[in-house]
Amino acid sequence: TIILTIILAFTGMCLRPPLMIPFVLAKSQPIPGTTLDSDNAWNDRFRAIRWDNDSDRWLLSTSEGFISVNEDFTGRPVKIPSSTTPPVSPMGITVFEKTTPGQWLIGSFSGLYNWNPATDKITDYYSGQPYSPAGKGRPLSAHLISGYSGDFNSQEPVVFDYYKGAENMPEMPDILRDQPMSLWNFALELHVGRAYEPIIGPFSELFVFLSGLTLLIILISGLVIHNRHHRRQKQHKIITNKK
């Protein structure tokens, strides 16, 4: 039972940063016989698809990057070089919208960018500055974009930030502001550690990792002490029987 609990604690730690990041970036072969073991080339790679009127082709967002395909998918898919496309977080694309002719808005936890596939021009949505790769590091931006909508009755589109919430939204009505949080949402906030952010600040992101590490130390040290105590008792019985 304790071995199973150790496995559960460690695998749970891998579902949140920092252990999650190397697992997300790493690639491995699927386990034979599982749902990921498929002959379909798009299986677990396809993320989103949009029709591009300017090029009369489909634009696809995949785990391998952006791909261009002709209208009826009879031609060979063409992978667009990553150096000419906006960065997309391993967590997946969250905004894939055409704003004006030739212009696309691409968003993810790696930021929000304006992209012109024809000219390969990429600019930051907030600063307007040209995008330049930052190199290897944490695959997250200062703006963790979780959604976008241009359907609200407002002058500016509404961008949803993971931490800041919705931008350019009208003030929340009192009837909604005073609504209590559901028990499910409250339990989720406790589970991932976000509920502790007012207390421990940015360390709340490490809550799952630190609590899992503490649990592992307790379990492993307890297992070691238990085994030592068991061996001593066994040796004591052997000595007693010999006497």
Per-range role (PLM):
Residues 103-106, 113, 152-192:
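Extended, hydrophilic extramembrane loops/domains of integral membrane proteins
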Residues 1-30, 193-242:
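Internal alpha-helical transmembrane segments
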Residues 37-51, 84-101, 129-152:
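Repeated scaffold domains used in trafficking and secretory/extracellular systems
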Residues 73-75, 119-121, 173:
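Short coil turn/linker residues within repeat-based beta-strand modules
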Residues 67-71, 114-118, 226:
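Hydrophobic/aromatic beta-strand positions that recur at structurally equivalent sites within the blades
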Residues 76-82, 123-131, 180:
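Beta-propeller fold detector
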Residues 21-79:
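Membrane-interface segments at or immediately adjacent to transmembrane helices
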Residues 64, 109-110:
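Residue-level signature of beta-propeller blades and closely related beta-rich strand-turn architectures
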